[in-house]
Amino acid sequence: MAVTQVIKRDGSRVGFDTSRIEAALAKAFEAAGEEPDGPRLAKVLEAIVAELSEGHREEAPSVEQIQDTVERQLVKQDLYEVSKRYIIYRAKRAEEREQRGELARRHALDGSLSMKKRDGRSEPFTYDKVGTTLRRLAEDLEEIDEDLILKELKKNIYSGIDAAEVEQALLLATVAFIERDPEYNVLASRILRQKLYREVIGRSVSSWDELVGEYRAAFVQGIRAGVERGHFDQTLLEFDLDALSQAIDPSRDELIKYVGVQTLYERYFVKVEGRLLETPQAFWMRVAMGLSIRERQRNVRAQEFYGILSSLRFVSSTPTLFHAGLTHPQLSSCYLSTVTDDLDHIFKCIGDNAQMSKWSGGIGNDWTSIRATGAMINSTKVESQGVIPFLKIANDTTVAINRSGKRRGATCAYLESWHLDIEDFLDLRRNTGDDRRRTHDMNTANWIPDLFMKRVVNEEMWSLFSPDEVPDLHESYGLEFEERYLEYERRAEKAEIKKFKQVEAIKLWRKMLTRLFETGHPWITFKDPANIRSPQDHAGVVHNSNLCTEITLNNSADETAVCNLGSVNLA
């Protein structure tokens, strides 16, 4: 997935702009006597973007990580002189930043720094106010070194800085010492929550009693605003909002450490037209209301759910946290489907993937039934291109869908190890070869029968088939599978099967492990244990697992398996 954002040195995020990398590269190329706008620069830039996209699928890269990537790619492409010039350029810029920081520190000491307040007015910047804030937030924290934080803060202060940037700089200065003592984690969480409270409530509050009152009032206002803007389900207005607001316990925010608050703030809290509607406890209560919306005693049940969620004894899965109480309450985590050897059904499943990903569902697709490369298509009398081209389409569908606007789509494709296209399947995540036969953004998994492992142990041959000629292999397991598999091998020896191939089982196993080491894929999953232990064996065969390989449910052409996840806190 392409990189879209960059984390700046002050912790803020900006759009990813390749022209900035290109400009720095051009200076290094020119300094090294190379063509600053030639094909070599374009090739390096392309490689840099590719590495960043591959290595930062979930989290945006920082400026330093981008610069490290530039250095690596220059060395990889034997541009040693250019690399040397870039390193010098990078060191010079770091020195300039340090000089600016030192100048700012001197200005801060002599009182000549200015700060822009939230109302637009300017006033002299002093560290006294920052120190007062620190002491207030760290009043009960004995291991906090105020001087250490202020010293780190001074590195990012400059004349004309605004109040929001000071707060962000203070947060980053505190985060820098989280590994020093857990209390810095608590303090960082409080600093971030202070910012969050101000954004939701609309102003700063000076006392705990005042915060509690404003906190609860903001919950009621947020629910009404969310319904008014068409974001929340109107049924939420039928709850006793005043009673629920009194059940909210703002002190439970202390249970959430810095990374937890940051994750909730960036990805989970509801924002409408740029306005944040939720505090942590309002968020838990909104989820609780969404889970109770069809209950007869909805207010009682909402308070019960809230008590469990807000105390972190149990936390629902991401789709539930995203959508509970919203106008489209899709609460399920994972979907497991099996794709049949029919063009209409193939594209129906791809369309289903798109819709389920759209609402934050994780996808596990079984593709074993699709006929292999070279198998004859009855209707057109031409040879099939196999399963790989369809997997490429499924991959690109995964890339195209941004799950609920919060994270990229995620899919895992499963294929049984006797499929004639299994060797191409193993290469899907490689960075070399024909990119039209690669799925860089989709997970893959081997669905391995026990018979294959027996052949590996005994160093025997393994037969690969096209599923259109062996349709019952995928619908059987255990002894029944072994009997049918051996029968198909005998038929292949008699030339009664058109498409098949024999490989050494141990060589195929080694290739599986090699690709797993190289690319992390395909994952290793086992068909027979999943089916032997299935409590639903009367309802059909388990064809695959889900995106995360922890759920095994049977499915069919007209039945998609669904799982709903949550985390129980055993601490």
Each model region followed by its residue ranges:
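Extended catalytic cores of very large enzyme megasubunits
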Residues: 1-571
